[in-house]
C-alpha cells in the first residue's frame, strides 16, 4: 500500500515522501497515529501544495539536530560496572545503560538513537555514535570504569 508521510519516521523516511508499506502497518499504525495518509491522486496534489511547509519542517528538524550535535560533541559519559577480573564486566553495557547515564546528565535521548554495534563487555573508553538525524551523527565518549568494592 502506498502512503505519504506526514512526519519524519526514522525507520521509513522523511516528511512528504511516498513509500510502499505493508497494508497492516499502514492501517494499524501509520493512519491511526496520523503519521501518514494514503497516496491517492487527490492527496498527492494536497502534498504538492504543502511541499514548502514540509521543506521548512525538514530544515527545522535538521537545524535542531545540528544544535543537539554541538551540545553532544564534548559529552563524556562515565558508567560504573562490576568487574570479575581486571577488565571483564559481569554483565554488559547496552544502549539502555548509556541512555540512563545521559539522562542523569540532563541529556534526553531515545535508546534507538544510540548506535552501539554490540554491548560493551570490558572496561575502557569507547566512542559511540548517536543518530540525531539521517546525516547528523555526533560521537560521545563512554568510559566504563570498575565499581569500587566495599568491604
Curated annotation (Swiss-Prot):
GO terms for molecular function: rRNA binding; structural constituent of ribosome. Keywords: Ribonucleoprotein, Ribosomal protein, RNA-binding, rRNA-binding. Disulfide bonds: none annotated. It holds the Pfam family Ribosomal_L9_C. Coiled coil: none annotated. Belongs to the bacterial ribosomal protein bL9 family. NCBIfam families: L9. This is Large ribosomal subunit protein bL9. It comes from Desulforapulum autotrophicum (strain ATCC 43914 / DSM 3382 / VKM B-1955 / HRM2) (Desulfobacterium autotrophicum).
Amino acid at each position: 500500500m502506498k502512503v505519504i508521510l506526514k512526519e519524519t519516521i526514522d525507520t521509513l523516511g522523511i516528511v512528504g515522501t511516498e513509500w510502499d508499506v505493508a497494508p497492516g502497518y499502514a492501517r494499524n499504525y501509520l493512519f491511526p497515529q496520523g503519521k501518514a495518509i494514503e497516496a491517492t491522486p487527490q492527496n498527492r496534489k494536497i502534498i504538492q501544495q504543502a511541499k514548502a511547509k514540509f521543506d521548512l519542517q525538514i530544515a527545522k528538524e535538521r537545524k535542531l539536530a545540528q544544535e543537539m550535535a554541538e551540545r553532544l560533541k564534548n559529552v563524556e559519559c562515565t558508567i560504573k560496572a562490576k568487574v570479575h577480573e581486571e577488565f571483564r564486566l559481569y554483565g554488559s553495557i547496552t544502549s539502555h545503560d548509556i541512555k540512563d547515564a545521559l539522562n542523569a546528565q540532563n541529556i534526553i535521548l531515545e535508546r534507538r538513537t544510540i548506535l552501539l554495534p554490540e554491548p560493551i563487555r570490558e572496561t575502557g573508553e569507547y566512542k559511540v555514535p548517536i543518530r540525531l538525524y539521517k546525516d547528523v551523527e555526533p560521537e560521545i565518549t563512554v568510559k566504563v570504569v570498575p565499581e569500587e568494592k566495599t568491604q
